[in-house]
Amino acid sequence: MGSKTLPAPVPIHPSLQLTNYSFLQAVNGLPTVPSDHLPNLYGFSALHAVHLHQWTLGYPAMHLPRSSFSKVPGAVSSLMDARFQLPAFPWFPHVIHPKPEITAGGSGAALKTKPRFDFANLALAATQEDPTKLGRGEGPGSPAGGLGALLDVTKLSPEKKPTRGRLPSKTKKEFVCKFCGRHFTKSYNLLIHERTHTDERPYTCDICHKAFRRQDHLRDHRYIHSKEKPFKCQECGKGFCQSRTLAVHKTLHSQVKELKTSKIKC
């Protein structure tokens, strides 16, 4: 079997020597950085899998103090090139500067001394002001208190909430017939309805002097005198002067069809 020749490693950065690859291999022996100091990042031992030019190019150089490399073995530190600089991560400041631990005499003690919620006296504890908030200036007169008052608007009942957007819909007007008490939403419909009680017919035909309650009824009536029949049946071709007369005629055709189908089934 012939021996397989491995391809030569591709240089990552022009300023780095090929000997720095041994540095990446030696980094695997370093202890893993705790996950709480590098959240959402890979461990320090996985740097050999990342192209180094993606970390060094395009970012400002950052010099770390010697204490940062206190855990690096001597064999690894001898392989480090002086020209190699770690990049700065402006979007991860907590990686370089870890969170300060809460000391026993600092704010941690204040958190421990905070009184617990008294469930025995529930009504009193709910209405009583928190002394810790008053000490930090979160009272009703403070800016934080004003913000809390604004946020309390969301807790109001639906009746007390201020209306936003559209104005409340107006109540529909109702027009009541004085003869029978029937309700209408439009005044014109009420006017036509009251003419059935009074038998008022203000629209009169000029030819035959027939009177009508509605103007559209007079318009349909005039087709009789002009012998125009604009409304024609699509089945038999018969013409009509009024649309409502054509509608009645169509019902006759539908009744005839029903009779034929019933005879066929029998």
From Swiss-Prot:
One of its GO terms (molecular function) is sequence-specific double-stranded DNA binding. The modification Asymmetric dimethylarginine is found at residue 116. Transmembrane segments: none annotated. One of its GO terms (cellular component) is nucleoplasm. It comes from the Eukaryota. Disruption phenotype: Mice die prenatally with severe heart defects including defective atrioventricular junction and venous valves. They never initiate metanephric kidney formation. Nephrogenic mesenchyme undergo massive apoptosis, which causes a disruption of nephric duct elongation and failure of metanephric induction. Pfam families: zf-C2H2. Signal peptide: none annotated. Induction: Transcriptionally regulated by Ikzf1 and Runx2. Keywords: Metal-binding, Methylation, Nucleus, Repeat, Transcription, Transcription regulation, Zinc, Zinc-finger. InterPro entries: C2H2-ZF_Transcription_Reg (IPR050717), Znf_C2H2_sf (IPR036236), Znf_C2H2_type (IPR013087). It is found in: Nucleus. GO terms for biological process: cell differentiation; cell proliferation involved in kidney development; cellular response to retinoic acid; chondrocyte differentiation; embryonic digit morphogenesis; embryonic forelimb morphogenesis; embryonic hindlimb morphogenesis; embryonic skeletal joint development. A zinc finger (C2H2-type) spans 175-197, 203-225, 231-253. Transcription factor that plays a role in the regulation of embryonic heart and urogenital development. Belongs to the Odd C2H2-type zinc-finger protein family. This is Protein odd-skipped-related 1. The lineage of its organism: Eukaryota, Metazoa, Chordata, Craniata, Vertebrata.
